[in-house]
Regions:
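N-terminal, cleavable Sec-dependent signal peptides of secreted/periplasmic/extracellular proteins
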Residues: 1-215
Length: 215
């Protein structure tokens, strides 16, 4: 391109070069992180020599963490709690790289990470919770069951509150329907006649876990 700027097909090569130099970033991440453990970001990337990861407290309610994921996202970010820049240089910047980034998270809560590439118009964001609670559902009986356990040890948790929700089909909002408590085996039984589409476990100050869908 530099040697033959007036070549009749030079614009084709310019467009191809622009495509090759466009940054690409795909990320898989945890929905829930155990307090004191790491948020793990699994990356596939091209042309991203550096990545800056910022983590904010989320101002959303946990049941609405996934709703309108990109709409009004900035206005729903609270205090920034972390900022880390990672060097992602590769010998051949035109080939896809993969890497895993880890960021320690200590305090319970709902958060949003925002990843940018310095000097590039590329931003990737998502939300996650820091919680000790995990919830598994079983719908083999007339009364669906929820098992609440410690996310790390798998130990059943007695006395946890399971909040259940349905989706308002008119406006897409998630509406709270009620709550039940877990027994000594960590099991809560949901009402059979209610239309329940999502559940979320809560235990005292551990109240920011993201909803689980019931199918």
């Amino acid at each position: 391109i530099r040697q033959y700027p007036k070549y009749e097909r030079v614009n084709i090569f310019k467009n191809q070069l622009n495509e090759m130099e466009t940054p690409v970033l795909n990320i898989q991440s945890d929905n829930n992180v155990y307090p004191g453990k790491n948020l793990t970001l699994q990356l596939k990337y091209v042309h991203t020599p550096q990545l800056t990861v910022r983590i904010y407290k989320s101002l959303r309610q946990p049941e609405n963490a996934w709703r309108n994921l990109y709409k009004n996202s900035k206005s729903m970010r609270g205090e920034q709690v972390k900022e880390i820049t990672f060097d992602m240089h590769r010998p051949n910047s035109y080939t896809e790289g993969d890497s895993t980034l880890t960021i320690p998270m200590d305090k319970l809560g709902l958060y949003e990470y925002v990843i940018t590439v310095p000097g590039k118009q590329l931003t990737v964001s998502n939300r996650f919770s820091v919680s000790r609670l995990a919830a598994l559902t079983r719908s083999q009986t007339n009364n669906p069951e929820v098992l609440v356990t410690d996310l790390e040890s798998g130990k059943p948790i007695e006395g946890a509150t399971v909040i259940y929700y349905k989706t308002n089909m008119m406006n897409g909002t998630i509406q709270r329907q009620g709550e039940v408590k877990t027994d000594r085996l960590g099991i809560a039984i949901l009402p059979a006649k209610k239309k329940i589409e999502h559940i979320r476990p809560v235990l005292r100050e551990d109240s920011s876990s993201i909803i689980t869908n019931i199918y």
